[in-house]
Amino acid sequence: MFILRLFVYNVVIFFVFLFIFGFLPNDSGRNPGREE
């Protein structure tokens, strides 16, 4: 039960990191042009 919960948390964190690292390049490409 505990290992299953740990595995689920790992998968969730993995997807969160994937979403952040996948969204950051797009945001960085748009942000500098707007700020400058």
Swiss-Prot record:
It holds the Pfam family PsbI. Keywords: Membrane, Photosynthesis, Photosystem II, Plastid, Reaction center, Transmembrane, Transmembrane helix. It comes from the Eukaryota. It is found in: Plastid membrane. Its main location: plastid. The chain crosses the membrane at residues 6-26. It is a single-pass membrane protein. One of its GO terms (cellular component) is photosystem II reaction center. PANTHER family: PHOTOSYSTEM II REACTION CENTER PROTEIN I (PTHR35772:SF1). PSII is composed of 1 copy each of membrane proteins PsbA, PsbB, PsbC, PsbD, PsbE, PsbF, PsbH, PsbI, PsbJ, PsbK, PsbL, PsbM, PsbT, PsbX, PsbY, PsbZ, Psb30/Ycf12, at least 3 peripheral proteins of the oxygen-evolving complex and a large number of cofactors. It forms dimeric complexes. Belongs to the PsbI family. One of the components of the core complex of photosystem II (PSII), required for its stability and/or assembly. PSII is a light-driven water:plastoquinone oxidoreductase that uses light energy to abstract electrons from H(2)O, generating O(2) and a proton gradient subsequently used for ATP formation. It consists of a core antenna complex that captures photons, and an electron transfer chain that converts photonic excitation into a charge separation. This is Photosystem II reaction center protein I. It comes from Orobanche minor (Small broomrape).
